[in-house]
């Protein structure tokens, strides 16, 4: 995993890492992804998670939560959310956006997450079922099972909160928006042939057409 640049963020955290795991409070899915992080099909393998962002003095009153759905086809952040409460609504909102953006394909989508309470919730599961999406979950306390999204969270924090002294939520919210736009549209990746995620998606669709 280290050679692929996929690292967990827990090893460098000075404050306690956010953990959405509350035990078995709903339905736990098997690990369908099994660390197979590559695909040549867009919208086939999606990974998601929640992380915490803090500013100023980094107290519990100076924190927000961020979640994203990443397509492993090109590493693009398809949908995301930032807010103060990492509840089920917080997760369902970008999930519904993802479903709305999803093109018609001949294959089924798999969405992989950890075992956080939001992903065990019936509302989340029902959205997946109604859209014929496979659910996949990491094993407990095994961040490498979801290494791609963990790695992105590290990059996001280095590009925002770790190197800036934000004074309030609005400042960090704007910084996150700008970073995601940069990451999707301009940050080139060697494995994408020196293209950004969006460039790769457009280039690939033009080749197929």
Question: What annotation goes with each model-predicted range?
Answer:
Residues 1, 33, 49, 75, ...:
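Mobile genetic element proteins and their domesticated derivatives, centered on retroelements
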Residues 1-41, 198-205:
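Basic, flexible linker segments flanking DNA-binding modules
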Residues 20, 113-115, 121-122, 137-157, ...:
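RNase H-like two-metal-ion nuclease catalytic core shared by retroviral integrases
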Residues 35-78:
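An active-site-proximal beta-strand-loop segment
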Residues 62, 81-105:
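Active-site beta-loop-alpha junctions of metal-dependent nucleic acid enzymes
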Residues 74-80, 135-138, 162-163:
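Short small-residue beta-strand/loop micro-motif enriched in glycine and branched aliphatics
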Residues 76, 104-109:
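Short, surface-exposed connector motifs at secondary-structure boundaries
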Residues 129-133, 155-209:
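C-terminal domain-tail junction helix/linker
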